[in-house]
Amino acid sequence: MIALADCNNFYASCERVFQPWLQNVPIVVLSNNDGCVIARSNEAKKLGVPMGAPAFKYEKVFQKNNVYVFSANFALYGDLSKRVMSTISQEINRMEVYSIDEVFMDFSSVSLLKEKAQEVKAKVKKWTGIPISIGVAPTKALAKVANYYAKKYTKQGVLVLNNPSHIARALKKLPVGELWGVGRKYAKFLAQRGIVTAYDLIKLDESWVRSNMTVVGLRLVQELKGTSCFDIEPVSPKKKNICTSRSFGHKVRSYTELKEAVAAYATTCSQKLRGEGSCAAVVSVFLTTNPFNLSETQYRASRRVQLSIPTSDSLEIVKAAIEGLSGIYKKGLVYKKAGVIVSDIVPQNQVQLSLFDAVDRSKRKWLMSSVDTINTRMGKDKVRLAVQGFDRKWRLKQEHLSPCYTTRFSDLLTVSL
């Protein structure tokens, strides 16, 4: 048996942990630059605020209904996610972190399924303040189905689907578009052929499914029938590339501002590489103007820079990124977005050094480790490269950002005795 734990309205729940007066009031969380709605509390959903809604179009709705609006605080959400996963790991020996707010758990050795799920749910709520729902079933896909119903239709937030008749009933009521991995395109394709529910899907000939939905679709159908095709993967596969990109908070024209932004993004990529114990051999940079503003000159370009030796050193990766930027920057244009991608990633212990390497890698490794330690303890970018800048006018617009309660010393809550 496999269980899926899914945090309820995760971003909104994170905001409530340190602001308990937000319980039972409508909350929305906005995307980068406070553009669109990317998370909603149940109260906001009842007001008819859809996912992806442009924030400016719903300002009157927010004001009229006293909706609390937050800029996305990914530092807070990421840290609370780690705390949720750490708490669950103390109860479950074998688990797979599927996303920032989802984790699959191996329940094959659990005898009292519902009781164990309720125990995990209660512990996560007590230790982290985050509410979760848990669905338990024979396969990952069915666990997703069970979680869907646990979240929407049960008071306890826990549902076990292990009875064939109960599974069939659940699939008959489940819209095919709600299935794991079935996006809008496939949902529309299936609906046009009269396949409306998950139960309709599993009644199709498997050869037709494979032909029209690839082998991934076939495995989904087999999972819904109770045959396990996707095992628990305790260790996430190493990334093939890492990208850091952002839309700018205002119009950017100057090379200096672009250089600061690209240096900051390259530094973030380097930190992620070190966190994985990996190194990259290629650094790519891209720039784009605003594709939705046709009154301005349109431009999009990228440049790939090959490193002589794979590295995770911020100094080397930033240098390569700036080299790439200088090759694609055009004066006079208004830029909306930039990004850095590191690729050709290899494990750090498999890097082949050069006899003529001029870099003292042991000293650089110590330096990067020291910088990471300080920034982890004191807050992001407390120690940074000068080229990253300090004014940073290009940064994201975050007018509704909550404090980083768990990752920044200056934002720690204080208690008066």
Model-found features: residue ranges?
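Short, charged/polar surface micro-motifs in flexible loops or helix N-caps
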Residues: 10, 33-36, 290-293, 345-349
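A general secondary-structure junction signal
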Residues: 136-140, 287-289, 339-344, 387-389
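C-terminal hydrophobic structural anchor segments
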Residues: 322-377
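Short, charged/polar, Gly/Pro-enriched secondary-structure boundary elements
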Residues: 111-115, 294, 346-353
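Short, hydrophobic beta-strand segments
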Residues: 103-108, 302-308, 351-357
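Short Gly/Ser/Thr- and Asp/Glu-enriched loop/turn motifs at secondary-structure junctions
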Residues: 98-102, 137-140, 278-282, 333-337
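Gly/Gly-Pro- and Ser/Thr-rich, intrinsically disordered tail segments characteristic of DNA damage-repair
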Residues: 1-222, 361-417
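DNA-contacting surface of Y-family translesion DNA polymerases
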Residues: 46, 186, 191-334, 350
